[in-house]
Amino acid sequence: MSDTDRRILFVHAHPDDESISTGATMAKYAAEGAHVCLVTCTLGEEGEIIPEELRHLASDKEDRLGEFRIGELKEACAALGVTDHRFLGGAGRWRDSGMMGAPSNDHPRCFWRADVEEAARLLAEIIREVRPQVIVTYDEHGHYGHPDHIQAHRVTVRARELAADPAHGEGEPWSAAKLYATATPRTVLARSIALMRDSRHPFERVSSIDQLGYGVPDDQVTTVVDARAHLPAKLAALRAHRTQVVVASEGPFFALSNNIGQQAFGAEYYTLLDGPRGPAVADGRESGLFSGLPGLE
């Protein structure tokens, strides 16, 4: 399928989030000819740096990690086939807040402290320009509780409202039909833990889902995108984020700075937050993010 009428917007908090949770989906839709737009809310300045030779870039040293990660993200987008990328408000407008409770939560420019209306107005401008039928971000809990993920959810929900409001701002109003949050079913994680346990890789193994810090009950997952054919693109994108991610030389496995092994999924899962639900296909779920939209499925 090649359909330039399909337009989808992904709103992510930091560089690498797009590749970890939605990389295969982005690569699939880009390869099919859809307009895939990625908006990143921060530069990821507070990330923990894996390569020892680059640790001088850390926020408590030279504080130049953010600018370095711009290059990583550019390389990752190229691997995914994504040509439309923007930083919300421009590169560096908002700063990575760090994990919940960290002193960096109090930085005056951190995204956690951003005025939601201001950030939403800027995102609404992008929505009106791109005119996506589908928007993807996180749930209200921020997937695993990161303050920037929570804020990205709040900003995206409000921006979608503003973009559709004829009384708001300049430009032609646009109503994005569907809003999704990233999600991983607990049963999928359980199978992944078993696979990680029985496979060869250099990472630490976990024995329970709770050790991963994310995963949702299966009945909350409405949609699965089978993008296994695009897993190589996702792995290439993960490798591009070398300050944050290590990818195994064998198998679809990776780890962040905590060295806990995770599976890179080719099938990616979502929860429909708002909009028409398409017909159930796989495991009672939609089989695509454009499902239920006439002429776009």
From Swiss-Prot:
Superkingdom of this protein's organism: Bacteria
Sequence positions that bind Zn(2+): H14, D17, H149
GO terms for MF: N-acetylglucosaminylinositol deacetylase activity; zinc ion binding
Functional note: Catalyzes the deacetylation of 1D-myo-inositol 2-acetamido-2-deoxy-alpha-D-glucopyranoside (GlcNAc-Ins) in the mycothiol biosynthesis pathway.
Family note: Belongs to the MshB deacetylase family.
Record-linked NCBIfam families: mycothiol_MshB
The name this protein goes by in its record: 1D-myo-inositol 2-acetamido-2-deoxy-alpha-D-glucopyranoside deacetylase
Gene source species: Thermomonospora curvata (strain ATCC 19995 / DSM 43183 / JCM 3096 / KCTC 9072 / NBRC 15933 / NCIMB 10081 / Henssen B9)
Lineage of the species this protein comes from: Bacteria, Bacillati, Actinomycetota, Actinomycetes, Streptosporangiales
